[in-house]
């Protein structure tokens, strides 16, 4: 429940549109809804501005669906990350408006389309191989109501590709830099823009990249100002933080 939805609910009870019994039934789900396999945080949007997101890894398909159905039953938009096509196909049987970004492994269900911000988030990626992380970040940012623009395959091996889009990137309120290998893109971008850069190291690379650890350490040790770093392959975390900045 968002702050606006809470205020609207209070008004309907006050005006008599909803009875006291209906109010009690509604409030029964606070502060969480227990569905057996999970306790859904029904107040998170009220506290943080965005509702609970379902992280799929480690959960069975049945558990994911049970949680999604419980969130959807309250009319709240649903975002599921690190998921699969099996969940999408089963969810589509009960929620026809469901969307699935297969590369980003993200499912979204929007009962109410969020109004997009006037300012935008730029997602800049070093290579095509970083695409899965880019798509996770993109779907998350859009779900949270952000105008979001992607600039793909613009890594340091060909700086002219980055420079060609620099004017648009500089127009963003916050930049997400997605890169594997040595992770140099974040530092280069931070030296060219005057907005926060959120760096996402990816697990793309050969042996000595250690599954993204080399990029993570390089980004943490950036000489350029304004770089903050999230965990390896964490497109969701980068987009969530970027959304908070973009909504300021």
Task: List each model region and its residues.
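Long amphipathic alpha-helical segments
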Residues: 1-84, 88, 93-94
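Short glycine-rich or small-residue beta-strand-to-loop segments that form or flank ligand, phosphate
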Residues: 53-54, 120-126, 175-177, 229-230
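Short glycine/serine/threonine-rich phosphate/pyrophosphate-binding segments
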Residues: 62-64, 130-135, 159-160, 179-188, ...
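Glycine-rich oxoanion-binding loops at beta->alpha junctions
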Residues: 106-110, 147-168, 213-214, 230
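Glycine-rich phosphate/diphosphate-binding loop of Rossmann-like nucleotide-binding domains
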Residues: 117-158
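C-terminal binding/interaction regions
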Residues: 125, 167, 202-248
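Glycine-rich phosphate-binding loop
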Residues: 164-202
